[in-house]
């Protein structure tokens, strides 16, 4: 049997969606983690902070002794049972701490004492993180084609249909606009970058890749920003622009923001709480751009939104939303995107309807 006690082939681990039993403190995990990792800490945040303070004041031996005192008895047993259960669930998993140091070795030794031989990641999360950063930089050097178009053009759907397409908005859990958030909270910046790196590695590994197909995005997608190496390449990339009829764009937006989001909120929270969350979501999206709309126009559109919500609640009809969505597109989103696109006019290589762009992509 191959010795798995330590792992250094980091790309292979990431490509395989290798389960990681991450024993870092919750605050470290929240700041950045790898896809597929589960957080079962050796020390909680307050315990880690106490050990860190002890290390600075009294040295490594005293800190280690304090750590053993903090994690003992019932606490020790509870955490050990959690690690055992995780390994039984993921027998191909690895232990991971910050740098492959004391914490993962301690947990590994405790598991060995129960008859479980769980390998660890040599270099820990830091090594995996560096691998992800390097992979993104390397793979971003491949040619890129952007899919552009005004809001409601179906760009994301088109990207998802491409074998070499990377759904940046899906990875970011955000659709890019002020109404772009989903029910799933966004990842931390580092976790988003790690997830992006793994996606790039996977797509690159399963085909002979000539170029990436990405949606034309700004620097940020919600709270996440694109890695600079990728953003720089996107700024110079050719663009295929989707130009669908306005009415078709409205129907896509109706389906995505009024029908699907209402369904998702009520499915997650129940009818009453879900309706309140859905209403709050739409109001928040409008509120986020109030200064750009002007406060008077914002107030007018908010009144229209309130009437549309009342109509939807009473009859189920989403038609009333068109009364604020149409001016929002005409006065804000469309002019903003067209202005941005004008600055990249030299990069445009094709224009057409959604289907025409899809056919053009197949022919490339």
UniProtKB/Swiss-Prot annotation:
Record EC number = 2.9.1.3
Q: Which UniProt keywords apply?
A: Selenium, Transferase
Which InterPro entries does this chain map to?
Rhodanese-like_dom, Rhodanese-like_dom_sf, SelU
> What is annotated as the active site?
97 (s-selanylcysteine intermediate)
By its UniProt entry, which Pfam families does this protein fall under?
Rhodanese (PF00581)
Residue ranges of domain Rhodanese in the record = 14-137
Is the Transmembrane keyword given for this protein?
no
Spell out the reaction equation it catalyses.
5-methylaminomethyl-2-thiouridine(34) in tRNA + selenophosphate + (2E)-geranyl diphosphate + H2O + H(+) = 5-methylaminomethyl-2-selenouridine(34) in tRNA + (2E)-thiogeraniol + phosphate + diphosphate; 5-methylaminomethyl-2-thiouridine(34) in tRNA + (2E)-geranyl diphosphate = 5-methylaminomethyl-S-(2E)-geranyl-thiouridine(34) in tRNA + diphosphate; 5-methylaminomethyl-S-(2E)-geranyl-thiouridine(34) in tRNA + selenophosphate + H(+) = 5-methylaminomethyl-2-(Se-phospho)selenouridine(34) in tRNA + (2E)-thiogeraniol; 5-methylaminomethyl-2-(Se-phospho)selenouridine(34) in tRNA + H2O = 5-methylaminomethyl-2-selenouridine(34) in tRNA + phosphate
Its GO biological process annotations read: tRNA wobble uridine modification
Give one GO term, molecular function aspect: tRNA 2-selenouridine synthase activity
Gene3D superfamilies linked: Rhodanese-like domain
User: What is stated as this protein's family in its record?
Assistant: Belongs to the SelU family.
Cross-referenced NCBIfam families: PRK11784.1-1 (NF008749), PRK11784.1-3 (NF008751), tRNA_sel_U_synt (TIGR03167)
Q: What does this protein do?
A: Involved in the post-transcriptional modification of the uridine at the wobble position (U34) of tRNA(Lys), tRNA(Glu) and tRNA(Gln). Catalyzes the conversion of 2-thiouridine (S2U-RNA) to 2-selenouridine (Se2U-RNA). Acts in a two-step process involving geranylation of 2-thiouridine (S2U) to S-geranyl-2-thiouridine (geS2U) and subsequent selenation of the latter derivative to 2-selenouridine (Se2U) in the tRNA chain.
Self-association state and partner proteins as the record states: Monomer.
Q: What protein does this entry describe?
A: tRNA 2-selenouridine synthase
């Amino acid at each position: 049997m191959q010795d798995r006690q330590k792992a250094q082939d980091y790309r292979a681990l990431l490509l395989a969606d290798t389960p990681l039993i991450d024993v870092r403190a919750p605050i470290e995990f929240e700041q950045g983690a790898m896809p597929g990792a589960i957080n079962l800490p050796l020390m909680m945040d307050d315990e880690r902070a106490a050990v860190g303070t002890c290390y600075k004041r009294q040295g490594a031996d005293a800190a280690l002794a304090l750590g053993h005192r903090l994690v003992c008895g019932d606490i020790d047993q509870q955490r050990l049972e959690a690690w055992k259960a995780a390994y039984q669930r993921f027998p191909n998993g690895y232990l991971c701490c910050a740098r492959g140091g004391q914490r993962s070795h301690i947990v590994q030794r405790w598991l060995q004492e129960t008859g479980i031989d769980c390998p660890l990641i040599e270099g820990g999360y830091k090594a995996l993180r560096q691998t992800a950063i390097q992979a993104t930089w390397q793979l971003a050097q491949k040619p890129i084609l952007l899919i552009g178009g005004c809001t409601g053009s179906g760009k994301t759907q088109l990207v998802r249909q491409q074998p070499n397409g990377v759904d940046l908005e899906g990875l970011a859990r955000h659709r890019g606009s002020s109404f772009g958030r989903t029910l799933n909270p966004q990842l931390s910046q580092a976790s988003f970058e790690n997830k992006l790196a793994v996606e790039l590695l996977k797509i690159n590994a399963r085909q002979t890749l000539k170029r990436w197909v990405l949606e034309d995005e700004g620097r940020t997608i919600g709270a996440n920003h694109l890695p600079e190496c990728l953003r720089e390449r996107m700024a110079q990339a050719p663009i295929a622009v989707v130009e669908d009829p306005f009415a078709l764009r409205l129907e896509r937006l109706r389906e995505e923001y009024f029908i699907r989001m209402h369904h998702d909120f009520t499915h997650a929270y129940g009818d009453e709480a879900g309706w309140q969350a859905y209403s709050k979501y739409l109001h928040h999206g409008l509120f986020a751009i109030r200064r750009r709309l002007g406060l008077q126009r914002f107030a007018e559109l908010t009144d229209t939104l309130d009437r549309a919500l009342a109509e939807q609640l009473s009859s189920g009809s989403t038609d009333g939303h068109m009364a604020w969505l149409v001016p929002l597109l005409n006065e804000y989103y469309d002019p903003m995107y067209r202005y941005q696109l004008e600055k990249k006019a030299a990069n445009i290589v094709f224009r057409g309807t959604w289907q025409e762009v899809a056919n053009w992509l197949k022919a490339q």
